[in-house]
Amino acid sequence: MGQGDATLIKCDGHSMLIDAGNNDKGTLVQNYLQHQGVETLDYVIGTHPDADHIGGMDVVLYKFDCKTIIMPDVANNTRTYDDVVQTMKNKGYKTTYPVVGETYTIGGAAFTIIAPNKEYGNDMNSWSVGVLLQNGNHRFLFTGDAEEGAEQDILQNGIDISADVYKVAHHGSNTATSQAFLDAVHPTYAVISAGEGNSYGHPHAEVLNRLRAAGVSVFRTDEQGTIVAASDGTTLTWNMSPSESWQA
């Protein structure tokens, strides 16, 4: 996937996609979904209108039957965003805006919207849709590129965000995963999606050290490629062992 985000969630024959990678990754995401047997996406969430999250979304929206498309109520003055809007129009899709506290079902699992909690002007990252997914005893937290200010707003909305698995915000940037937020999530596992040798230096050492100090097991796409977690509601298994190098 490189320096971008895409997460596929499958449960009881239902599928959900959170983000779709960068502009040049749409076909890669499409091929992965098809390889996984996906024909219909019950939910597509574009966390925020930055290219590394919605770049491939026009391809996904065009190629798959998409039921509910959730994106924040903010526009971005970019060709990438325009491509998504145009594809939505061409397919007759409507945007569902996220409402904090609303819960949706996906098979036997469910997810709750936890962000955005207010309007953030032109700060696209802070508009990120946050989702807490629950399958049986397992909880997974996804916050897009939400940064520290948006994390504070999540902490103040009263929703319990403790989770077994935390998809680390903003590719492991030190502008996110504040100590207070990490303490509230208290994850056992963390997944960092970042491009190998990316120019941003993601994930940042401060975040890795914060996770290490909290005893969290970390998985990294820049070192390990596609990471798969399987939950039956009681047992959680992974397609590989946690990264070792992050402990440097």
Regions inferred by a protein language model and the residue ranges of each:
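Non-globular, low-confidence helical/coil segments that flank catalytic cores
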Residues: M1-A248
